[in-house]
Amino acid sequence: MKPYLMIHDIRKEYFDLNLDQYRLTFDDGLYSQYYYFPLLKKHPAELTFFITTSFIKPGRARGQYAGEYRPYLKTKKYAYRTFIENRFDHFMTLAEIQELAAQPNVRIGVHSHLHDVILTRTHASKRKPLSPWKLERFENRPEIVTENWSIRSRLAFQGYDYKNDRLTRRSEAEWEDYIKYDTQLCVSWMEDNLGFTTDLYCFPFNEHNEKLISILRTFGFKQFFAARPGKSSEVNGRIDVDNLVD
């Protein structure tokens, strides 16, 4: 079987690669993935789009590639637009997702609803840079750029929370409730906006374990994806396309 390729925002250079030797997957639901669909639609394998459902807003279908390449957005740049400037124009609109979903060679999967994170305080002498892609809870909070905040991108999905200036692990029951809440939002969004559900799930931050997989299975998910499969034989690993570009 051909290996899976993991793609976020699309660069012009990707089209110089021999993409036909891969099965293409696209994370987050970015507009560039819709924009370049005319160049992708003849790909010999199915195209799989993993959308973060809370990022998809109502809106019309915009233009697609007709010879002009778009500027490439690094994840740090589009994260700033999303979570500091509260802009979502770099993600697909609902109309664009619906158009892609109707294509015969397209599969729609989910990448969680919130892509959630934890915000913590750090010591002034040990400040950590803002994570480039993990500010979902903190829209309209420009003060986090200058104050002593640390964005803990993976910890929410690892079962942690931050309360009373302390990073603590949720109880197993609390963590399960959190995962079920986020997943139900995904499933409901798919039903309400696309008229179908999906059995494809891509893990936020590549965080996965057997318990998480067992919970997701109760919602009907059967195929799981991450950048790395880890120890699980149930998870499809993927190659980051940027590792192939000089």
Task: Identify the residue ranges that each predicted region occupies.
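Active-site beta->alpha N-cap acidic-glycine motif
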Residues: 2-122, 127-131
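C-terminal active-site subregion of NodB/CE4 polysaccharide deacetylases
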Residues: 1-26, 30-35, 42-43, 120-246
